């Protein structure tokens, strides 16, 4: 059975003030309200089979933000005469079909789509499968220094004829299809990592003795990885005893955390956990609504232990200085 591949692009409006909404008890910030959808159905050689284009009339951000108008060329009249957003989104998802695999240039649009579906009381569980076509492109054409990854820059670099405007949803989607026809799209999609594989690659980047990699999916609370014992409590990779984490957690990058744990049974022994075990986490909110938490243990060596002690000492000093400053301001 042929795959139902949908390339899509969204244009969305934003407000002059942030808008938050309640998602299953958790406040989330609205990324933007969709005002235009462009989509094409393609086969695995990126031949266009069907197209979809629609302007939507927003309900929340009704006034067109000036920056959005400048980038997209949309006018307030375009928004005002658009199809009501609930009706338009329902029609788009019906056109896609329940088995659709979505693809976009980047990973910005699916979270926006899912938030909009939820706020319109539509099923936000779809899509369940989607691809970042930038990653498929980079598999064949590794990025060189100074090269941009915007759709326009890649279209220029690949010599695709520029016969349509950019920042028009359907036009951008057709350009994406043009680029895909210059790739081995079948191989790129076949090699595309699952979310778990991508999290493993991110969490276990450097060489080391990593163990017990696990991913926990579907959480709406960002800090559930610290609060839920199922996620926060980890067994010792050597003996199975629950590890005891240090009071200090260090942040690495935007969404990675780690600490040095001790095993009550192994500490001081000659086995791999005798000097402690690093407990590592990588957080991801790929769909814009739910958090996934990747966790693993890393057995330390002399170099990583020395680096931990140095960074831990620096963190304690920052905490001490902050506490003294707050006390002085009272």
Regions found by a protein language model. Give the residues of each.
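Conserved non-catalytic scaffold segment of RNase H-like nuclease domains
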Residues: 2-111, 272-314
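Short loop/turn and capping residues at structural boundaries
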Residues: 18, 80, 128, 165-166, ...
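A general structural-boundary detector
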Residues: 26, 75, 79, 100, ...
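Metal-dependent phosphoesterase core characteristic of DEDDh/y 3'-5' exonuclease domains
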Residues: 31-37, 41-72, 93-219, 283-287
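Acidic two-metal-ion nuclease catalytic site recognized across multiple nuclease folds
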Residues: 182-330
């Amino acid at each position: 059975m042929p795959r139902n591949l949908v390339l899509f692009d969204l244009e969305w409006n934003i407000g002059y003030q942030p808008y938050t909404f309640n998602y299953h008890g958790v406040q989330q910030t609205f990324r933007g309200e969709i005002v235009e959808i462009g989509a094409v159905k393609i086969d695995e050689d990126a031949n266009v089979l069907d197209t979809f284009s629609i302007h939507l009339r927003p309900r929340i951000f009704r006034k067109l933000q000036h920056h959005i108008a400048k980038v997209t060329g949309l006018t307030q009249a375009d928004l005002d005469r658009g199809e009501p957003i609930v009706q338009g989104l329902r029609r788009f998802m019906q056109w896609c079909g329940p088995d659709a695999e979505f693809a976009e240039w980047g990973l910005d649009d699916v979270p926006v789509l899912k938030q909009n579906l939820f706020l319109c009381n539509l099923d936000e569980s779809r899509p369940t499968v989607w691809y970042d076509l930038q990653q498929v492109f980079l598999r064949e054409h590794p990025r060189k220094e100074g090269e941009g990854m915007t759709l326009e820059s890649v279209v220029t670099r690949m010599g695709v004829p520029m016969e349509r405007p950019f920042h028009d949803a359907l036009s951008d989607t057709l350009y994406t299809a043009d680029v895909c026809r210059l790739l081995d799209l079948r191989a790129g999609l076949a090699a595309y990592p699952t979310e778990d594989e991508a999290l493993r690659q991110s969490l276990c980047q450097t060489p080391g003795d990593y163990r017990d990699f696990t991913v926990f999916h579907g959480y709406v609370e960002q800090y559930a990885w610290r609060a839920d014992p199922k996620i926060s409590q980890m067994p010792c990779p050597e003996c199975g005893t629950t590890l005891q984490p240090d009071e200090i957690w260090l942040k690495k990058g935007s969404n990675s955390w780690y600490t040095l744990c001790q095993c009550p049974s192994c500490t001081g022994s000659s086995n791999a956990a005798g000097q402690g075990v690093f407990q590592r986490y990588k957080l991801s909110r790929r769909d814009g609504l739910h958090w996934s938490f990747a966790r693993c243990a890393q057995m330390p060596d002399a170099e990583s232990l020395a680096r931990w002690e140095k960074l831990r000492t620096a963190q304690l000093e920052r905490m001490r200085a902050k506490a003294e400053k707050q006390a002085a301001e009272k």
